[in-house]
């Protein structure tokens, strides 16, 4: 894995998931350890900041009336019914912890569904940057992380999903996806293993 041709794709790091007052905060059980996932992600970003690895944030944002969701089902129906990720709301904002790295993380708008490539410029940008490896972190493992990872694999990218930087709805779901689903199309590893693979050594910050 070459750092100069690798991108860290950050999915769902928004207030509606990670803030205690977020509309979808209760979708994630405490057993999934959301604060640990966030802490691991921030540690990874800090370590990668001086490196040539690209870092991209893909927030999901819906219009006021959710007109882009025609007869939604599943999680998208829940999002519409609860009013989550609505444009202009506090819940749609990227969490402050990630905003602190705004000079290093590129935000790509347009995501309005489960797959981060849909309705965004990700594929074009990754081609321009010469990306070969996509590393995925974020929420929710069984939904947006899995959908995006499968699509990236289908496009021919080498996909890595970080087991300690992705968030399932509970610990059982997270373990199942990391052990049984993700390995079907991706490498699964911790962020420490990724840093070793990229030859980025821990430093005291």
Regions from the PLM with identified roles:
Residues 27-39, 79-89:
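A short acidic, glycine-rich active-site loop
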Residues 13, 60, 164:
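Active-site loop/turn elements of alpha/beta-hydrolase fold enzymes
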Residues 16-30:
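Glycine-rich N-terminal loop/short-helix segment of MobA-like nucleotidyltransferase
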Residues 1-7, 17, 47-51, 66-68, ...:
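Active-site-adjacent betaalpha module
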Residues 57-65:
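Catalytic-core segment of enzymes that process non-peptidic bonds
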Residues 36-54:
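A short, N-terminal amphipathic alpha-helix
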